[in-house]
Amino acid sequence: MNHSDTLSLSLELLQQPSVTPIDHTCQTIMADRLAKVGFHIEPMRFGDVDNLWARRGTEGPVFCFAGHTDVVPTGRLDAWNSDPFAPEIRDGKLYGRGSADMKTALAAMVVASERFVAKHPNHKGSIAFLITSDEEGPAVNGTVKVIETLEKRNEKITWCLVGEPSSTHKLGDIVKNGRRGSLNAVLKVQGKQGHVAYPHLARNPIHEASPALAELCQTVWDNGNEYFPATSFQISNIHAGTGATNVIPGALEVTFNFRYSTEVTAEQLKQRVHEILDKHGLQYEIVWNLSGLPFLTPVGELVNAAQTAILNVTGTETELSTSGGTSDGRFIAPTGAQVLELGVLNATIHQINEHVDVHDLDPLTDIYEQILENLLA
């Protein structure tokens, strides 16, 4: 079976067990290909994380492909139909950890760039790659550190295409032109431990906090807007008690998350939470962690270039969306760059038997190449 350039490179990347934060030579494989077509290669290692900044050209505007070589753990190996790091093609589908999220997109980016440079050796501006091995993990020493380095030397990205798996039913049907913000909190409510038979001598933090938690769950934080759904509040963990049936717990710990729109700020959400907790007279402390600001790329050069390319290659009228979790786009957008996410179908990401349709890989490459044509030819 003759494999296309994109499929061959995908297979090579998928053989690397690059579980966060281990890159396992994926970036070297990509860098070697890019160096051959004139990219300046700059590895950036921070802590235990490998990052790659590769650039062809010295002038603006700068078009940047962004993505990650790391993958999530496999889960139970005996639940997979084949070795997750020995990629297999079965019934037209390519199986392997990272096949959808997002090594096939990385391969498509490299091949698209090779083809574009061959046709346009003196293209306008610059093409760049920003690749990390820590997107699925803490994301502390990855993209954010590369962006900080670029900012210090005033190296600006004009347009950024992140290869996250954005498609839902068919290739290119959804492009992410923004993401909601993500605000996490750990709430600790203090009570007084005691015997369940003597509740008057204790204070049950579960009982005291329950009305406040119910109110938080029922609160309408905003109604969203044309780009973003309404802000969502979700409790992810609750813990209290010693495990004994006859002890009133002395404290309650609750972890919750906001996925929020541009209609509110993180500070406004914090203030409203404190108002509700204070109204219920709780003795509490709360630790906040803002893991991502919301961002939005309005219709403009990058959106138009992507929509035109998708329509030309697949015949699909693409839809703009801001749904889903956070991505590394949240670190790139604050620099002023236009950011889009466009990749393969996301139906099996992080799952056992993760896979992607082989017949989507060459069209994705064509889309990426045509976006380059639309912006830099």
From Swiss-Prot:
Binding locations of Zn(2+) 1: H68, D101, E164
Pfam families: M20_dimer, Peptidase_M20
Active site: D70, E135 (proton acceptor)
Domain of life, source organism: Bacteria
Co-factor remark: Binds 2 Zn(2+) or Co(2+) ions per subunit.
InterPro entries, per the entry: Bact_exopeptidase_dim_dom (IPR036264), DapE_proteobac (IPR005941), Peptidase_M20 (IPR002933), Peptidase_M20_dimer (IPR011650), Peptidase_M20A (IPR050072)
Cofactor(s) needed: Zn(2+); Co(2+)
Keyword entries, A-Z: Amino-acid biosynthesis, Cobalt, Diaminopimelate biosynthesis, Hydrolase, Lysine biosynthesis, Metal-binding, Zinc
Enzyme Commission number, as recorded: 3.5.1.18
One of the GO biological process terms: L-arginine biosynthetic process
Broad enzyme group: hydrolase
Subunit structure: Homodimer.
Family: Belongs to the peptidase M20A family. DapE subfamily.
Name the UniProt record assigns to this protein: Succinyl-diaminopimelate desuccinylase
Source organism of the structure: Acinetobacter baumannii (strain AB307-0294)
